[in-house]
Every structure is written in C-alpha cells, then in structure tokens.
Regions:
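N-terminal membrane-targeting hydrophobic helices
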Residues: 1-181
Length: 181
C-alpha cells in the first residue's frame, strides 16, 4: 500500500515541499511555529484535490458502483481499501469538480486574494499548495492525452496551444501569488 501511495503522491509531495521551502525563504521565517505552519499547510494542500473522489461518491453519483464501494470502505474505516480503490479507479471518473478548469480559475483568484489579505501562513501555504498541485494535475492530464477531462465543462475544448497558453497564465499567477506571500 505504501508503495502505491508513494508512486501516486511522490511528485505532488515534491511540489508541496518545494513550495514550502520557497515560501519559508521568501518570508524569511525564523520561528519554528511559522515554519511548521507553512510546511503543514503545504502538505495538507497536497491531498485536497483527492476529495473529488469522495464528492463524487457521496454527492454527485452515489448510485454508481465506484461510489457504493468507496462508501462501504469509508463506513468501515478501511483505509487500505479506500486507497487501493481510488488508486485503481483514478482515471475512471469523468467530470470531476475539483480537477477542472472552473475550480482552477476560482483557485487562481482565491490564491491572489488569500495571499494578499491574510497573515495566517497555514492558510496561505494551503491555498498555494492546492493551486500548484492543480497546475501539475492539469499538465499531467494534458501529457497523458486526457486534457478533455480537465476542460469537460467547456463547450469548445481548447487546442494544444490553448492548453499551453492557459497553463502559462496559471504559472504566472502562481509566481505572482508566491511573490505576494
């Protein structure tokens, strides 16, 4: 199970830890509590996008086989089988809410607003980590040839150059948000 978790989360964790190091460096944080809050926010943000499977199972399609199985594992607190079930069926779900262009646009706006308005480093690191991992997941879908899954809500799917331009804009927003930190 740990090998599956490591294979699934090694790049998102690397992104989150890199982001935490950058945020600590930019903030020039010297207190242990501040460093801990930034690292904790970044690490928690790594796993946020996977709530999509639970949203799907409990709210969007509770009658599907995937949902019934996941709900059963969740009711019995069988974490090993929850991880296995999500790992083996991660590409079976279409039209995810958190892994989509609309949530990503909202997240881009939220990252700028949260970073510029609050002084609580845990929340700032949390939102920026979600945003950075969202960009990674979008490019992962793009390079696997599943970009239509990311842009499922749009009537006209963007072409290759449109996806790359959109990704570049998101990276610029992320850099701007990190700079505001």
């Amino acid at each position: 199970m740990f090998k599956k978790l490591w294979n699934f989360y090694k790049i998102p964790l690397l992104i989150s830890l890199t982001l935490a190091i950058v945020l600590i460096s930019i903030k020039v944080e010297k207190q242990v509590l501040g460093i801990t809050l930034i690292v904790l926010g970044s690490l928690i943000g790594t796993f946020f996008l996977d709530l999509d499977y639970f949203i799907w199972a409990f709210f969007l399609e509770p009658a599907s086989d995937f949902s019934k199985t996941l709900a059963g594992y969740t009711r019995h607190a069988d974490f090993m089988n929850i991880v296995n079930h999500i790992y083996y069926h991660k590409n079976d779900l279409r039209e995810k809410t958190l892994n989509s262009v609309f949530f990503q646009i909202v997240l881009a706006g939220m990252s700028v607003i949260v970073v510029s308005s609050t002084h609580f480093n845990l929340i700032k690191a949390f939102v920026l980590s979600i945003f950075a991992n969202s960009i990674y997941r979008m490019f992962e879908c793009y390079f696997e040839g599943r970009a239509d899954e990311w842009f499922w809500a749009l009537k006209n799917k963007p072409k290759r150059s449109g996806v790359i331009l959109y990704g570049a804009v998101l990276i610029v927003v992320l850099i701007f948000s990190v700079k505001l930190f």
